[in-house]
Design a protein with these regions (language model features):
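Extended alpha-helical targeting/anchoring segments
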Residues: 1-467
């Protein structure tokens, strides 16, 4: 792979650059942490697309369209695995993403990793994986106030001269940007939120799950509910959804912010939680369970943190998720390399603090990035425990594909480092509706009406920021 790049003093911010193009991918962080908020990544053009459904792998590029129906999951692993390039320059190696695959893996990818789940029907047309093949990016370094403009030939095999021509075109984008005003929001009718499962049915489902738990079938399960409303954005769909993303970033800042608008359904997300990372040969997952608001003063903040760390119910749930994370990492790590590097520490964000742990291991070099993702997907946070049994019960009781919700959103870099957020607090927007999904953790003493209210509260906190 050839790489050409230039480093420029940032003439604009990511919002201004991204706003002037209809189709784009934006990956950034809205936290104030130095390690999590340093970079923003913006990409406009994809060389191709990789789409996995339950029965077929589709690979779409300018030169070919491939449809594989024989062992599509294995074909996907081989296809992604072949695009592996070493980054020799330390300056570029430090950046989160310079080229590779960006997109999402759905909750339902688990049906490929565990074929036993395919006996359970799951209605829906969502893709199990949808990746865009990215060769050109703008990476904003907010601490140095610089932009890395990067062009590669990871997929296209373009010549070095062609790469420099592409780089010049990317830099010329800055001169084409007009500092226009934000799109005027039209008068929209009052939102009528439509859940996919009515209240009585959902309460009955929670009762069924409780019965299973009380019989010893599982410890916890996380059912979900989809909420949607008609948005009436019309011809302003693209600028208004990006405006919505910016509003979400202001009102609900999170470590993982993402906006995908590349011609299909639009993803807008503000996730507080990492799903999986791979860096320098290490695979890492961060179980999060236990949340409390931030205090108004330092003293109150510390008192609230101590209250959270003394809540045995929260600690018990957190330990269970740590055990699930250890089991998931064990399947893909070198023997003896598993480490619990953080155990039940407090991580503070703008409005809340969480109990967070960290499990890492050395990645088995024989595995592809897709092996790593499929081994951990979905996390226990959004499925339950034991994980496979909980997922079986979810599909039995709610025979629908979850799609993006509770899957992973992010990237696989060309050097096979990767970083995916857990796809919660995520909206899927099509030409007519905004969709948001929310779940609740059902345990032996859950109150069904309270679990229903939890899904309503989570969905409302996301949908209330919409225009």
């Amino acid at each position: 792979m050839n790489i050409v790049y230039r480093v420029l003093d940032a003439p604009i911010n990511p919002e201004t650059l991204a706003r002037h193009r209809q189709h784009k991918i934006v990956l950034e962080s809205a936290t104030t942490s130095q390690t999590k908020g340093r970079y923003s990544v913006v990409a406009f053009d994809a060389y191709g697309e990789v789409i996995l459904t339950e029965a077929q792998l589709n690979i779409l590029t300018p030169h070919q369209t491939l449809q594989e129906t024989t062992a599509p999951f294995e074909q996907l692993k081989a296809f992604v695995g072949q695009y592996h390039a070493h980054i020799s320059e330390p300056e570029l190696e430090a950046l989160p993403f310079i080229s590779g695959f960006a997109g999402y893996c759905s909750f339902d990818l688990v049906r490929h990793a565990f074929p036993v789940l395919q006996q359970y029907p799951a209605a829906g047309t969502t893709h199990d994986i949808h990746f865009y093949m990215i060769e050109s990016v703008y990476v904003f370094d907010h601490y140095k106030e610089q932009i890395y403009v990067i062009a590669t030939n990871l997929f296209s095999k373009a010549s070095e001269n062609e790469l420099y021509e592409r780089l010049d075109e990317m830099i010329a984008e800055f001169d084409q940007i007009e500092l226009f005003e934000t799109t005027q929001v039209p008068d929209l009718p009052e939102k009528v939120i439509e859940p996919n499962i009515d209240e009585a049915t959902f309460i009955e489902q929670v009762q069924q799950f409780k019965g299973r738990i009380q019989q010893g079938d599982m410890f916890q399960v996380v059912p979900s509910r989809i909420y949607r409303y008609a948005h009436h954005f019309g011809e302003q769909l693209h600028p208004l959804t990006y405006q919505l993303y910016q509003k979400l970033k202001r009102n609900n800042p999170s470590p993982y912010m993402f906006y995908f608008n590349m011609g299909g359904p639009i993803l807008v997300g503000s996730s507080p939680e990492s799903f999986v990372k791979v860096k320098a040969g290490k695979v890492m997952t961060n179980p999060i369970a236990g949340t409390i608001k931030r205090g108004a003063t330092d003293e109150e903040d510390q008192q609230l943190a101590e209250t959270l760390l003394s809540d045995e119910k929260e600690l018990s749930e957190h330990r269970m998720l740590v055990d699930l994370g250890r089991n998931d990492i064990l399947r893909i790590a070198r023997p003896g390399s598993l480490e619990l590097t953080k155990l039940m520490t407090i991580e503070r964000y703008e409005h809340v603090m969480h109990i967070v742990s960290e499990v890492i291991g050395d990645v088995d070099p024989r595995l592809s990035p897709i092996d790593v993702i499929a081994s951990l997907l979905p996390t226990g946070t959004v499925s339950g425990a034991p994980k496979l049994r909980a997922i079986q019960r979810i599909y039995e009781t709610q025979p629908l594909k979850r799609g993006v919700y509770s899957g992973g959103v992010g990237y696989i870099n060309c050097d096979h480092t990767l970083d995916l957020a857990l796809a919660i607090r995520t909206m899927v927007i099509d030409e007519t509706h905004v969709h948001a999904e929310a779940g609740c953790g059902v345990v032996y003493d859950s109150v069904p009406e309270k679990e229903l209210a939890e899904t309503q509260l989570k969905a409302k906190s996301l949908l209330e920021v919409t225009l």
